[in-house]
Regions:
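Catalytic Cys-His active-site segments of thiol-dependent hydrolases/isopeptidases
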Residues: 97-102, 138-163
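Catalytic cysteine-centered active-site loop
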Residues: 62-121, 155-157, 166-170
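A generic structural signal for residues embedded in beta-strands
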Residues: 126-127
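Sec/Tat-exported extracytoplasmic proteins
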Residues: 1-2, 20, 24-31, 54-62, ...
Length: 176
């Protein structure tokens, strides 16, 4: 889809490999085997890369409950909150589960639990919306998160007390 190349290339585009490799931080050990980047996918330099990857979709998506679980949905910019988080981490080489099966429930059991006072950009934050842990996003700092929301698609939203998501934040923070 040539019209998508300006947005960082989509799977199947000529520039896809280059677009993905700019986020890859893996190394090769002395024995010649690949190693996993240290520091995980969030709360580190990789956390900033996850945010940068996610920000490329701001204004280019729409929220569809259950969306983002097929390549055609992704190509069309249809995501829900959990599929967006999965997509952003996938862009930096962090696998948080299969494309077809990601939910807030599968994301909340992964990674390391972090005290909300210790949140860093790239950490994953959860909200009690229509159910416990019903919404998820990526913390960007300054009490804000990047997520795919119903009215905005992918956007940055406030977690300040007194705002919708600020009042729904349940304190669950995970670092992948």
């Amino acid at each position: 889809r040539p019209e998508m190349i300006p947005y960082g290339a989509c799977y199947g585009d000529a520039l896809y490999v280059s677009a993905v490799l700019k986020y890859y931080t893996g190394t090769i050990a002395a024995d010649g085997k690949p190693t996993t980047p240290s520091g995980g996918g969030s709360g580190s330099k990789s956390g900033v890369k996850v945010i940068e990857a996610g920000e490329t979709l701001i204004g280019k998506t729409r929220y569809v409950f259950g969306g983002g679980r097929s390549q055609s949905d992704i190509n069309a910019g249809r995501f829900d909150c959990s599929s967006f988080v999965r997509w952003a981490f996938e862009q930096v080489g962090v696998n948080v589960g299969p494309l077809s099966g990601v939910t807030t429930d599968t994301l909340k059991i992964q990674g390391q639990a972090i005290n909300p006072k210790d949140m860093k950009p790239g950490d994953v934050v959860f909200f009690d919306t229509y159910k416990k842990d019903g919404h998820v996003g990526i913390y960007v700092g300054d009490n804000k998160f990047l997520g795919c929301q119903g009215k905005t698609g992918v956007a940055i939203a406030s977690m300040e007390k007194g705002t919708y998501f600020g009042d729904k934040f349940n304190g669950r923070v995970k670092r992948f």
